[in-house]
């Protein structure tokens, strides 16, 4: 401890710090590769001019990414989302300060900055993250709103955040208890753990507990960072990008008149018909279900979900991107997978084609709503391996007296 002023010894009780940097390399490599995969898939889209008027776009970024105004429209969800997101921003800054002091000798962790920010503020925001996780878990597992998607991934994300924060408080509390840190009171929650631990644990036990928990905390944190680009947590990157590249034209101004007599096809019939911004939109989805909640058809009881369509398209995009990257050919198709080349424009089998039925993406079975008998069912036709023209979700009418899609 530096007697000249408030601070603490970095990596107290931790040896073999070199191992942390060895583990950091694959962590960063895995995370960067995951992010690169997303960017590579977006680059396959058609051009879209979305970088004009930077001042207006920065203003949108500040309002909706930083201030999170849209998220705050749902008061309860907005509060816990801000607790978690702002808390992680502060914790990340604090970790960066430690790294700068330890690796570059910046001596930032001194004096009032150490007391007011690195101790008190960081402790406070760490507690807000825990409170946010508790609120999110209560909403997801007790209230259970219908608009949410209930997956193991969401559970693991909340559990990982919970474990990371709890470990941080334990490491801090046991360090304060073992060293009798004179500045420990500035970390109220860590100090609470220290006061509770002193009567129960010897100094030697505190050392062992601190060391073991520190390495476990490192492993969980690095694992979470590496895993992040492969989960819906990728929205911490895609959401700000999506907001910045928003369509600034007035609502409806981008629509074009369609000549129904001369136009041969409507919309898009393959992933190649989407712009890069459309593909970014798919990856920016957080599965919150707000689009489905305000869907007029869904509001009147029709089980049509815009959210499910977005997730279907995203699964298809990711599937096609993985397959095309492997460079596999048609002969590598799974059994009964539909080849779009085996059908003509009328959907009939062509010579040399195989009469193969459409199959669903395995993930989509969980998400697809049960459509009423009169409603069309959404089926995903898997693309050809290595094909540049994968099939998109197809509205296939279910047998009924009327094949018209129910309207709200």
Regions found by a protein language model. Name each.
Residues 255-282, 290-292, 298-322, 333-358, ...:
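Ferredoxin-type iron-sulfur electron-transfer modules in oxidoreductases and energy-metabolism complexes
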Residues 39-43, 219-220, 288-292, 388-392:
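Short acidic (Asp/Glu) and glycine-rich catalytic loops that position anionic groups and cofactors
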Residues 325-327:
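Acidic, glycine-centered low-complexity repeats within long intrinsically disordered regions
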Residues 113, 117, 320-322, 360:
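Small-residue-biased low-complexity repeat regions
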Residues 1-269, 274-276, 311:
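Membrane-embedded alpha-helical bundles of multi-pass integral membrane proteins
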